[in-house]
Structures are given as structure tokens and as C-alpha cells.
Amino acid sequence: MLEPGDDAPDFELPDQHGDLVSLSDFRGEHVVVYFYPRADTPGCTTEACGFRDSWDEFEDRDATVLGISDDPVSDLDSFAEKYDLPFTLLSDEDGSVSSAYDSYGEKNMFGKTFDGVFRNSYLVGPDGTVERVYEGVSPDGHADEILADLDG
């Protein structure tokens, strides 16, 4: 698992509009990189809407939010539009970025084993280093937890 003080792995992924976005594009500001299993499912919607509802507070702190899943771009576009999400969603269909962030691997659900995205988040500082790691987060209140850490 990445730890505070580690360099956050840079990446380049397509966003919900198909445009390529890199972590390094946001150098100089805080970035919340949050990994979620599947767009438009109950937990992931709760988490995304928490970030949406707190968006102004993130902007007030010069912080941005990047949500990453292994969904295709078209699903991310629909998800962002349906819930009026103001932040960037990124498609990591091959799981390579999620893996680099220790957020992809074997999961068990309903007696089935499969590979998928873990619900982890990272607060990346303006210098590109990991400031905080949130492992196995609860979708409820996660945005507020990160805002409190930004104020810390």
C-alpha cells in the first residue's frame, strides 16, 4: 500500500468525455484520487454524490477530485450526467492505474471471486506526494472526512 510521503504514481487516463487527463496536470493543488468499483451502483453513487454536494468546499480549499473506476468512458459520461457530477471521472479499464495505487485485485462477493477495484482514496499534496491514505472507505461521509483532513 502506498503510504504518506510516497510519490503518487502519475497516470494518464481518459475522462468521461474521452479527453486524456494526467495527475501531473494538477501539480500545485491538492488532489483527491478516489477509486470506486462501479458507476451508478448504490455505494458508488452515494460516494460520488457526497463529493458533488461538497464540491464548493473542495474548490474553496484549492482541491480537486478525480474518481477512477474500470468502467468504460461511455458509462462514466452517463453517470456524471445523471447525477450532475462536477468533477472528473477517469476510465481505467485495464486496472493498471488502480493496481499502481494498490486499489485493484481479487474480490469476493456473493460467493464469487473476481478482480475489481477496491474503494480506496488518496489525498495527494501540491508537490505530488501522498499526504493521506484512506483504505476500504465507507461511501457515507467520506468527502467530509477528506475535507476535515484538508483543514487539519
What feature does the model see in each segment?
Residues 1-152:
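Chalcogenol-based redox active-site neighborhoods
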